[in-house]
Curated annotation (Swiss-Prot):
The gene is hldE. This is Bifunctional protein HldE. CDD domains: RfaE_like. It comes from Vibrio atlanticus (strain LGP32). Catalyzes the ADP transfer from ATP to D-glycero-beta-D-manno-heptose 1-phosphate, yielding ADP-D-glycero-beta-D-manno-heptose. In the N-terminal section; belongs to the carbohydrate kinase PfkB family. Residues 1-318 are annotated as: Ribokinase. ATP binds at N195, M196, A197, E198. Residues 344-476 are annotated as: Cytidylyltransferase. Its EC number is 2.7.1.167, 2.7.7.70. The lineage of its organism: Bacteria, Pseudomonadati, Pseudomonadota, Gammaproteobacteria, Vibrionales. The active site is at D264.
Length: 476
């Protein structure tokens, strides 16, 4: 299965769980300490990254999704670092800051690619008032399409059953990265993502794939889950659902450097993909591809839609299909770095017909990459009037993404794509019809940047308006 990337900018995901800050100190080792038989590290640089549930939220943001995070922290400097780092990625931080606890922080000392020691600064959050989190969840739920509960057994999910019930009552699916052998506490969740060790801790040792499937389905029945996604390291992943054939995905990892944060990536891509409208099996395929990318990186890592598209389609088909605006800008930068000429056009494309296909083919011939910017439903309605569009945005974009001439499809909500074109600045801007180049939205900006503006003729006899009239008249 090679799924087309969804438009992650349409996905809103609420992350609730154990928030952490990962710190890294890097430096060479050249001698043993005279004080004790340990290496001396000369620290030359350092790095700070969101970890745990914060890494999950960062993964969603890196895809262009809208992440809202609720978690427990202290009133301290690490909490401020997390808020600033996540805020810069447009993650909405809603932390419960407690006086008597430190923000969970893990410091790793690294030398020559090896971790020498890890220092943990933490106290488990215990006996906290569940309303502190529930009230924040209640405010966030109307604005999200999925919920992730990220459990590292640090206390933020002490009242996890209340959180599950709150989300399910709002008809929002709940995805959980579990911790420990007690799956009873996760009863009623939509899907759990245990790794093989976590699975066997609950179900017992398995000797074959058939036995794993049998035990997994039994867990689904016992704890009222809708599904389990068992991550199996070099054996890939297996999606188990009641009444549906098991769906197995082989691993896509080429090299494994570090599995830190891989589970965070799996659940973030899975939940964001479902929130963006993907069915569960396609969302799992995207999560599997994402895991194959991040295990090839050091430490807690995120990935971009460009990297995810390359993992699915190969480097020659980078970011094929529907893409967010932020990811498109990055994809265009990469295309330019390769010396590729980028062509851009736009329109409503409500009912795709032969004239559109011919137009796309001609536009694609002008360069190496073709972007199609598509008016959202609200924009089409303002431009075309009541009754339009006939097809909603996601379907129009999916059809365009299926054309061989088209590389990227991106939505825009304004009446014209002038702002979007100014951000992208294609090598060639193309419009169909009898426009003059100076009349085309975004044309002045493209020309000022050294690009070209071209007008292409539409094929005679092809018109969306005429097709709609023919359908209403019962002809054709």
């Amino acid at each position: 299965m090679k799924p087309i990337l969804p438009d992650y900018s349409q996905s809103g995901v609420l992350v609730v769980g154990d928030v952490m800050l990962d710190r890294y100190w890097y430096g060479p080792t050249g001698r043993i300490s005279p004080e004790a038989p340990v290496p001396v590290v000369k620290v030359e640089n350092n790095e700070e990254r969101p970890g745990g549930a914060a890494n999950v939220a960062m993964n969603i943001a890196s895809l262009g999704g809208h992440a809202h995070i609720v978690g427990l922290t202290g009133k301290d400097e690490p909490a401020e670092v997390l808020k600033n780092t996540l805020g810069a990625l447009k993650v909405k931080c809603d932390f419960v800051e407690l006086d008597d606890y430190p923000t969970i922080t893990k410091l790793r000392v690294m030398s020559r690619g090896q971790q020498l020691i890890r220092l943990d600064f933490e106290d488990k959050f215990e006996n906290t008032d569940p309303e502190l989190v529930l009230s924040r969840m209640e405010q966030a739920l109307p604005n999200v399409r999925s919920v992730i509960l990220s459990d590292y057994a640090k206390g933020a999910l002490e009242h996890v059953q209340s959180f599950i019930q709150k989300a399910r009552a709002a008809n929002v699916p709940v995805f959980i990265d579990p911790k420990g052998a007690d799956f009873e506490r996760y009863r009623g969740a939509t899907l759990l993502t245990p790794n093989m060790a976590e699975f066997e801790l609950v179900a017992g040792k398995v000797k074959s794939e058939d036995e794993m499937i049998e035990k997994g389905l039994a867990l689904i029945e016992e704890f009222d889950f809708e599904a389990l996604l068992v991550t199996r390291s070099e054996h890939g992943m297996t999606l188990l659902r009641k009444g549906v054939e098991p769906f197995h995905l082989p691993t896509q990892a080429k090299e494994v450097y570090d599995v830190t944060g891989a589970g965070d990536t799996v659940i973030s891509v899975l939940a964001a993909s479902v929130a963006a409208g993907k069915p569960l099996d396609e969302a799992c395929a995207l999560a599997n591809a994402a895991a194959g990318v991040v295990v090839g990186k050091l430490g807690t890592s995120t990935l971009s839609t460009i990297e995810l598209a390359e993992a699915i389609h190969g480097s020659q088909d980078t970011d094929y299909g529907v893409i967010s605006e932020a990811a498109l800008v990055e994809a265009v930068k990469r295309a330019r770095a390769k010396g590729e000429k980028v062509v851009m056009t736009n329109g409503c494309f409500d009912i795709l017909h032969a004239g559109h296909v011919s137009y796309m083919n001609h536009a694609a011939e002008l360069g190496d990459r073709l972007i199609v910017a598509v008016n959202t439903d609200e924009s089409v309605k303002r431009l075309k009037g009541p009754g339009r569009p006939v097809n909603p945005t996601d379907r129009r974009m999916a059809v365009l993404a299926g054309l061989g001439a088209v590389d990227w499809v991106v939505p825009f909500s304004e009446d014209t794509p002038q702002r979007l074109i100014s951000e992208v600045l294609p090598s060639i801007l193309v419009k169909g019809g009898d426009y003059k180049p100076e009349e085309i939205a975004g044309g002045a900006e493209v020309i000022a940047a050294g690009g070209e503006v071209k007008v292409l003729n539409f094929e005679d006899g092809c018109s969306t308006t005429e097709i709609i009239k023919a359908i209403k008249g019962g002809r054709g």
